[in-house]
Amino acid sequence: MDAREHPALLAEDDEQHLLGLLTYAIDGDRCEVLTLHAAEQWRGAGTALIEEVERVAVAAGCRELWLITTNDNVDALRFYQRKGFRLAALHPGAVDRSRGSLKPEIPEIGDYGIPLRDELELHKEVAP
C-alpha cells in the first residue's frame, strides 16, 4: 500500500504551516484511515483530521471508519479510543509475518521498548 496513491487531508495553522496529514481509502460503506501524522501532539491537528475524514466518509455514504495500528503504538490507541474508536480485532503475529516476508526493516522493538509483534484493528460507526 502506497499512501501517496490515496486521498489526503491536511491540517494547517493560520499561516498555512502544515500541522498534520491524514490519508484514507473508501471501499463501499467503509472508510479506512491509512495514515495519520500530526507534527506536534496536543495542538488539535489529529482531532481536526479525524473529524474531517468522518465528514468525508459520511458524505460518501460510509457507515464505518476503521484503521490498523501496532501493539506498541499506545499513544495512537489512547488517541483513537478518545475519538470514539473501539478495539475490534487483534491480529497476533501480523507484524512478525510482515517483517519476515514483506518488510524486513520493521524493527523488533517499537515505541516505549515494547516488542513489535501484533496489529490491532479499531472501528468507529459513523452516522450517514
Q: What is each of the regions a protein language model found here?
A:
Residues 57-69:
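Conserved GNAT acetyl-CoA-binding A-motif
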